[in-house]
Amino acid sequence: MAHKKGVGSSRNGRDSESKRLGVKEGDGKFVSAGSILVRQRGTKIYPGDNVGRGGDDTLFAKVDGIVKFERKGRDKKQVSIVVPEVVAQ
């Protein structure tokens, strides 16, 4: 039996495609309704006010407003959308 594998063959060279997860819109940024805020696996960040959660745990804006990341208790995070007050003139 050969103790070396045949020439020109490799058992490496496979990898899965990256999933492009993470925060998509930063804190303090103005976003429109339907904008994706966070792509994640599981609820690493929880939805707050005016934020929805998709079937794949993606967080998205339900209304136009400003993104606000905040702590939820001691060890959890959440993202909310703050609707700016309309200034009457």
UniProtKB/Swiss-Prot annotation:
Keyword Ribosomal protein: yes
Composition skew (Basic and acidic residues), residue ranges: 12-26
Highest taxon, organism lineage: Bacteria
GO biological process: translation
Keywords: Ribonucleoprotein, Ribosomal protein
Keyword Transmembrane: no
Ranges annotated as spanning the membrane: none
Region (Disordered): 1-26
Alphabetical list of InterPro entries matching this protein: Ribosomal_bL27 (IPR001684), Ribosomal_bL27_CS (IPR018261)
A GO cellular component annotation in the UniProt record: cytosolic large ribosomal subunit
Single annotated GO MF: structural constituent of ribosome
Entry similarity comment: Belongs to the bacterial ribosomal protein bL27 family.
UniProt xrefs under PANTHER family: LARGE RIBOSOMAL SUBUNIT PROTEIN BL27M (PTHR15893:SF0), RIBOSOMAL PROTEIN L27 (PTHR15893)
HAMAP family the UniProt entry points to: Ribosomal_bL27
Protein name, UniProt field: Large ribosomal subunit protein bL27
Organism from which the protein derives: Desulforamulus reducens (strain ATCC BAA-1160 / DSM 100696 / MI-1)
